[in-house]
Design a protein with these regions (language model features):
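HIT superfamily nucleotide-processing domains
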Residues: 1-134
Length: 134
């Protein structure tokens, strides 16, 4: 039942942790605190393809991660999205937004991303991991 993570995600994101259903990865864009949840199920492209138990678990994990992102990055606004036009593998974006970020109120995709420096990447991953351990 375990799903392999798309090569695109491996190239453009960093592993944070595994939850019961989803793998959590940090998108390599230092402009925005941005994680993706990737369900560990084979050949799934849409939420409706998950069984009802996994649909409920996915919702719980989305809500859990959303609360953590708000707490960690001290934001009041999140973008929670399931798009999948470029990478069809089911994944959910959770992006902490601010009225002060570079594209507010537009989409994060309207500007080119900025990869994390090695130092900031380690710091950000450790910051997020800490909350998953609590």
């Amino acid at each position: 039942m375990t799903n392999k993570v798309s090569k695109s995600f491996i190239k453009n994101s960093h592993l944070i942790t595994d939850l019961k259903l989803c793998i959590i990865r940090l998108i390599d864009n230092a402009k925005f605190p941005w994680i993706i949840l990737i369900p560990k199920r084979k050949n799934i492209t849409d939420i409706s393809e998950l069984n009802s138990k996994d649909q409920m678990l996915l919702m719980k994990e989305i809500v859990h991660c959303s609360k953590l992102m708000k707490k960690i990055f001290k934001t009041k606004k999140l973008n929670v999205e399931k798009i999948g036009n470029i990478v069809p593998q089911l994944h959910i974006h959770i992006i902490a937004r601010s009225t002060k970020d570079s594209t507010w109120p537009l989409s994060v995709w309207v500007v080119k991303g900025k990869p994390y420096s090695k130092v900031l990447l380690v710091k950000t991953i450790n910051k997020i991991k800490k909350y998953f351990k609590d």
